[in-house]
């Protein structure tokens, strides 16, 4: 089994990757030569985290070791997020912090989405960065580390998705892992610059995915989370129609006679077909959980956003999911303050959240991204109005989510118990099938005397609600 990586943070929303000191993969030499220790900080989404895990695997295979702390590292790698202004600012803050904490001889490599689109700003603000490596070019990490001069590679042309076999070192707890099945995006939503950053859709081959899936299961992973920019587009760059490639992949995974949870992230409403719903119903190993970004429900706004759906379509698919999979948990994301959004259209969004309560709702203020179609749209909304609408919708969302959670009180559900609460060992934390790691609430366990091992599934009776979390005890 691969050694377990720990997530520690310079800040709480960063993944700071460090290995346990007493473990080393047998195929990688364990040595403690000066100048060979590396440290990763991965920002942003799980897709970025997978890239960091692959880069780390490449370096460990080449004989490098992981430094347990930032200050001990000879090489520091920051995998940035550049999706929104707030994420770019976090990336800049992280670079500044790392530069202030690193030892003088340490080399800093900055990679990821922000490098792809804002490399000039990074070089101008932080001339002491040693190397810039573009998003998706994970195989360039070895060159970046070994280079004796400052350098730059801005290219995502050779993604590891197309490269076949690559090493990877997991940084998640041993019982779950992300599996990226595609990179890039073929859609052109008005507010988004992901196609510019990540390039066009590139699907990973089915056989390679199945090989990785089987490897994860053999390592003891019990929950595999499928990710892509858009799972529903998987295989369409290779000629697949509608959802056929994804359905075929899922069916092949389900042929494996083993217990596991399979979680699907990022499926657009127009891609949730009757066939997918039927497959989810037919095998409980597919978590009754869908991350379905709808962004808005006013048809005029949806059209301006270049979304291939309507309010009527969204209501229809939610209604169908509730009818066919009664215990389904639906996560979505909503944008307030999109150019031209009127108070009446915003109220329509509020009413929708109340009328069609969803289990998890992420709310974002529209970010005016240079290069996006929406950047030049008229009737831009003021920051003050965006902030006001954000807080008003958040208040409604909190009430709706809490009402949904209270319906769970008294139920006995399967929960993977993940460990002690970070603030006290009097509590344990876990998740049920309707909760995805890092983005959703958790189950707080106040009586875990029957828990024999973390990462295992236990039956928990829900007794209370605390904010976005459930409270219960193992029975």
UniProtKB/Swiss-Prot annotation:
Transmembrane segments: none
Gene Ontology CC terms, in alphabetical order: cytosol
Main location: cytoplasm
Cell location: Cytoplasm
UniProt entry tagged with the keyword Phosphoprotein: no
Gene Ontology terms, MF aspect: 4 iron, 4 sulfur cluster binding; aspartic acid methylthiotransferase activity; metal ion binding; protein methylthiotransferase activity
Cofactor binding mode and count: Binds 2 [4Fe-4S] clusters. One cluster is coordinated with 3 cysteines and an exchangeable S-adenosyl-L-methionine.
SUPFAM superfamilies the record matches: Radical SAM enzymes (SSF102114)
Main enzyme class: transferase
Protein name: Ribosomal protein uS12 methylthiotransferase RimO
Keywords (A to Z) from UniProt: 4Fe-4S, Cytoplasm, Iron, Iron-sulfur, Metal-binding, S-adenosyl-L-methionine, Transferase
């Amino acid at each position: 089994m691969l050694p377990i990586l720990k997530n520690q943070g310079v800040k709480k929303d960063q993944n700071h990757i460090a290995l346990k000191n007493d473990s080393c993969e047998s195929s990688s030499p364990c040595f403690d030569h000066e100048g060979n220790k590396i440290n990763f900080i991965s920002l942003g989404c799980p897709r970025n985290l997978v890239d960091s895990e692959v880069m780390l695997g490449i370096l460990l295979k080449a004989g490098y070791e992981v430094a347990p702390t930032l200050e001990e590292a000879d090489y520091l790698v920051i995998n940035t997020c550049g999706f929104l202004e707030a994420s770019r600012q976090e990336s800049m803050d992280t670079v500044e912090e790392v530069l202030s904490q690193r030892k003088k001889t340490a080399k800093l490599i900055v990679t990821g989405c922000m490098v792809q689109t804002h490399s000039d700003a990074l070089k101008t603000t932080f001339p002491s960065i040693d190397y810039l490596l573009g998003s998706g070019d994970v195989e360039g990490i070895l060159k970046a580390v070994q280079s004796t001069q400052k350098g730059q590679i801005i290219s995502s042309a050779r993604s590891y998705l197309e490269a076949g076999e690559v090493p990877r070192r997991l940084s998640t707890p041993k019982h779950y892992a992300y599996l990226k099945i595609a990179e890039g995006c073929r859609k052109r939503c008005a507010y988004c610059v992901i196609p510019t950053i990540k390039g066009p859709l590139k699907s990973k081959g089915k056989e390679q995915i199945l090989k990785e899936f089987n490897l994860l299961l053999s390592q003891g992973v019990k929950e595999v989370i499928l990710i892509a920019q858009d799972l529903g587009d998987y295989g369409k760059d290779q000629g697949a129609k509608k959802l056929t490639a994804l359905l075929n992949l899922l069916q092949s995974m389900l042929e494996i006679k083993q217990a596991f949870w399979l979680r699907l992230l990022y499926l657009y409403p127009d891609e949730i077909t009757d066939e997918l719903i039927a497959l989810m119903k037919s095998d409980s190993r597919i978590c009754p959980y869908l991350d379905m970004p709808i962004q808005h429900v006013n048809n005029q706004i949806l059209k301006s956003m270049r979304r291939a759906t309507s309010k009527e379509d969204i209501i229809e698919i939610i209604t169908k999911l509730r009818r066919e999979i009664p215990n389904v948990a639906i996560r979505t994301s909503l944008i307030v303050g999109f150019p031209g959004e009127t108070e009446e259209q915003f109220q329509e969004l509020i009413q929708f959240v109340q009328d069609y309560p969803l289990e998890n709702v992420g709310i974002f203020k529209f970010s005016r991204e240079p290069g996006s179609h929406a950047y030049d749209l008229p009737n831009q909304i003021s920051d003050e109005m965006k902030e006001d609408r954000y807080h008003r919708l958040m208040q409604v969302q909190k009430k709706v989510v809490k009402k949904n959670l209270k319906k769970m009180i008294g139920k006995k559900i399967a929960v993977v118990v993940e460990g002690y609460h970070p603030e006290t060992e009097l509590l344990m934390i876990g998740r049920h099938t309707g909760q995805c790691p890092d983005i959703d609430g958790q189950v707080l366990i106040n009586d875990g005397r029957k828990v024999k091992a973390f990462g295992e599934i236990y039956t928990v009776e829900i007794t209370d609600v605390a904010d976005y979390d459930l409270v219960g005890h193992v029975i």
